[in-house]
Each structure stands twice: as structure tokens, then as C-alpha cells.
A protein has these predicted regions:
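OB-fold/S1-family single-stranded nucleic acid-binding modules
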Residues: 114-130
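Positively charged n-region of N-terminal signal peptides that target proteins for export
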Residues: 1-5
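Cleaved targeting-peptide boundary
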Residues: 20-32
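Structural detector for short beta-strands of small beta-barrel domains
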Residues: 34-68, 110
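Short nucleic-acid-contacting surface segments enriched for D/E, G, S/T with interspersed K/R
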Residues: 91-107
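OB-fold (S1/OB) nucleic-acid-binding surfaces
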Residues: 57-85
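Flexible glycine-rich surface loops and low-complexity tracts that mediate binding to linear polymers
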Residues: 38-40, 102-116
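Bacterial N-terminal signal peptides
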Residues: 7-19
């Protein structure tokens, strides 16, 4: 029960963050990020943060959570940085480019943002990583 509460809180926080980005875009405000390339594992951030779940054994669960609305994260396993995946336009699916790569290592080209210690990326191009 405690884990469900934690997962619910993480999911709600991610949805609020994504919604705030969508609203900013609707008001004609320009997003200010840096075009970057990130290589890392596509993870379900709620399960990774709360229960340290990742890898091939967690692929099906991660895909189910993504289909239910949880945005993926990109975990840079070389330095431990987790990038929350965002979408750059309102009502778009942030997981669209990543669904086939759940729990795999990919290279993502996109716009990276950092605020108050949190990092996020809006993917523009995804290729299978090494």
C-alpha cells in the first residue's frame, strides 16, 4: 500500500509537470532548453525511483505503465542522471518515440531542460543505443 501511495505521488507530480509545460506552450511561450544528445536506458521512472526496477525483466510492466499514462524516463547509467521525458506540444504522447524501446538503451536527440535539480528531455529522434 505504501508503494502504491509513492507511485501515485510520483505519477501525479509527473502529470502536473507535463501539464504545466503544455499550458506554457498554449500561451505562446517558447520553451527554453538546449539541443542535446543523451544515451541511456528507457525506464518507468515510478518503478525505478520507488523500487529500483529496471532492465529486461521489467519491460512488460514499464510498457503497461506507459500505456496507462506514465511518461518514460531516460536513465544515463554512466552517471545516474534520470531525465523525465516530456512532449513539446499539448495533448501529444511523450512516449510515442520510446514505446518500442522500453527498458533498452537508446540514444535520444532532443531538447534538454534543467530546473531545481530535475532534468527533462523532449525527444526529437531516438535510435537504439549501445
Amino acid at each position: 500500500m505504501r508503494y502504491l501511495s509513492i507511485l501515485g505521488a510520483l505519477a501525479m507530480g509527473a502529470m502536473i509537470f507535463v501539464s504545466s509545460q503544455a499550458i506554457a506552450g498554449q500561451d505562446g511561450m517558447k520553451m527554453h532548453g538546449t539541443d542535446s544528445t543523451v544515451t541511456g536506458r528507457v525506464v518507468d521512472p515510478a518503478c525505478y525511483i520507488a523500487m529500483d526496477l529496471k532492465g529486461a525483466a521489467h519491460k512488460e510492466c514499464a510498457q503497461k505503465c506507459a500505456k496507462a499514462g506514465q511518461a518514460f524516463g531516460i536513465l544515463d547509467e554512466t552517471n545516474g542522471i534520470l531525465y523525465q521525458v516530456l512532449e513539446g506540444s499539448p495533448m501529444a504522447d511523450p512516449n510515442a518515440l520510446l514505446m518500442d524501446h522500453a527498458e533498452e538503451v537508446v540514444t535520444v536527440k532532443g531538447m534538454v531542460f534543467e530546473k531545481n535539480g530535475m532534468k527533462a528531455i523532449v525527444p526529437k529522434e531516438v535510435t537504439k543505443g549501445s
